[in-house]
Structure formats: C-alpha cells, structure tokens
C-alpha cells in the first residue's frame, strides 16, 4: 500500500544461499515510509536520486569525408545509472554496524538486486541493478566506537537494461469458435515495443497472423503432452518444443529461414489471435490447455 501520496522506493537484495537453501534477499524501505519503518530496516535515502528519468540515447550518424551534414542511421539506448546518497541508521553503534553489514551483504559482486518504485497511480516497476564501482567510498570522520549513524554515504546502482520492468503478465487465449483463440488485454508499457512469449499446447497445429506486410506463420503439429514456446524478442528469438519427459527440441531449423516478428503496442489494448489448423490426432481432438501469451511490461521512466 502506498503511504499517503508519496513515492515508495525499496531495494530488494538478490537471492542468496544460507548454507541449506536459497532464501530471498532482504528488503530496505528507502523512502516514502514512516520513519519508524525505515529505522527498522536501517537504511534510508539521504537526498534525491539522479538518473531516474528518461534514458540517455546515443545517436549514430554517418558522415562523409569533406561533406557537410550526415545521416542518422541508428539510435542506441544503453545502460542506466542511478546515483544518490544514503543514511545508515540505528539506535546504538552495534545496531548501526548490523545494518551496515546487512546493506553490503545484499549487494554481492555481480549479483543483481531490484530497485523498486511504487506510486499510487502507476504500475509498480523496478530496475535490475548492481552497485556502481564507487558505491560506499567515503571518509567517515566520526569515531567508529561511537558511530550511531552513517550520513550521506555516496551510493549508486547500474542496470545493463535502460528501462524499468513491471510484473510479468500472462493472458490465456480463449476459444471463440472456428478454431480461433483470442486474447484482448491492455499493455501499460511506455517503451515503443514489447516482445512477448507465446506458449502453444500439445494436440494441434497452429497458425499466427504476423500483421501487416507479413505472411502467416504455421507451427508443426505439437504432440499431446508437449508445449511449444516462441519468443519474439530479436535479441533472443527462440522456437523450442518441450516434450512430456522434459526434453527440448530447437525447431528453427525446420522453419526454412522464416522468423516471425511480433511486438505489442504500448499504452493501448492489444488483440492477439492464433488459429488451430488441424488436430495432431484426429481420434483425440483436444488440446492440453489454452494457448498463452506472456510478457514483461517495460517503462521509460520511474513514473
């Protein structure tokens, strides 16, 4: 629940091994909570954070020798870096040291935590982050034996992805007759394109409409007990089938170079349709489940 009309900022450490099992990382309520709750976690933001708004785009321009001007050939959006200062709190020097150790324990090398942002009117969203190289480097002039508060310690996080993620979302495609399976859903994302994953159940052969200017895409017949997954993300485009024993088969070699391209429109209703073309077994005409589309919303900014 959002505290009044404030923005809640929470850092969640990555999962860690406690010697017997994997446990969730600790949560630190950094801002937007009553002071008593921040004191319980032991860390708060000292000031604001920089790097939360729109990501920085790099324009790549092709210029010719001895020719004025140039051509914009690409726009690249790189990583995101967030920086600020934190206070480490406690009712005694021993408690401050405890919170200090906990904060660092939840920022292990190369392990990604999550920096969450909650507002009353917007979707919850997070950055997948590691601490920056210079995080925590400062001089504390107070006697360590009397240290009951660390103030304005420089801190920062870096994310190798420029956008904020929302909660992963799944929608079943319901049968509407004549072999058509449809889902209509709102995509809250604010980035230009979101690439979903499509899960197709065993029991049939399916056809997808890829949109304007693209041909239809047909799967091969999917055996009962198997599931086919198509990921449309161009960075990791995949088409695999998992059988009833858990074995995976890469199906791209069977597609003769065909690579379906689908993305979801931001901040609007999206309609997604697949069509059942034929049954895998005419003597057992049923599917293992409904088809399903899954995606993770992405946002340009923290609000």
Tell what function each PLM region has.
Residues 167-303:
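Intrinsically disordered, low-complexity segments enriched in serine, threonine, and glycine
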Residues 67-95, 147-163:
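Oligomerization/assembly interface segments of phage tail-like spikes and tubes
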């Amino acid at each position: 629940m959002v505290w009044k009309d404030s923005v809640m900022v929470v850092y969640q450490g990555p999962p860690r091994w406690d010697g017997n099992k994997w446990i969730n990382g600790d949560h630190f309520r950094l801002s937007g909570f009553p002071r008593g709750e921040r004191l319980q976690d032991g860390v708060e933001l000292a000031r604001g954070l920089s790097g939360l708004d729109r990501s920085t785009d790099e324009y790549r321009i092709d210029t010719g020798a001895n020719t004025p001007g140039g051509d914009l050939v690409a726009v690249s959006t790189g990583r995101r870096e967030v920086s600020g200062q934190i206070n480490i709190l406690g009712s005694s020097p021993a408690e401050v040291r405890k919170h200090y150790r906990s904060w660092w324990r939840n920022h292990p090398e190369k392990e990604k935590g999550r920096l969450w942002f909650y507002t009353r009117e917007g979707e919850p969203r997070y950055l997948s982050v590691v601490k920056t190289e210079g995080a925590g480097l400062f001089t504390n002039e107070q006697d360590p034996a009397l240290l009951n508060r660390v103030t304005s310690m420089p801190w920062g996080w870096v994310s190798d992805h420029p956008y904020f993620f929302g909660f992963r979302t799944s929608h079943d495609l319901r049968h509407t007759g004549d072999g058509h399976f449809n889902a209509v859903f709102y995509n809250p994302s604010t980035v230009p394109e979101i690439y979903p994953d499509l899960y197709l159940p065993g029991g049939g052969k399916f056809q997808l409409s890829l949109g304007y200017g693209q041909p239809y895409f047909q799967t091969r017949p999917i055996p009962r007990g198997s599931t086919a997954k198509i990921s449309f993300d161009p960075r990791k485009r995949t088409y695999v089938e998992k059988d009833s024993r858990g074995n995976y088969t890469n199906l791209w070699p069977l597609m003769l170079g065909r690579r379906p391209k689908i993305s979801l429109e931001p901040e609007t209703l999206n309609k997604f349709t697949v069509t059942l073309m034929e049954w895998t077994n005419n003597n057992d005409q049923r599917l293992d489940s409904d088809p399903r589309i899954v995606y993770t919303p992405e946002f340009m900014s923290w609000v």
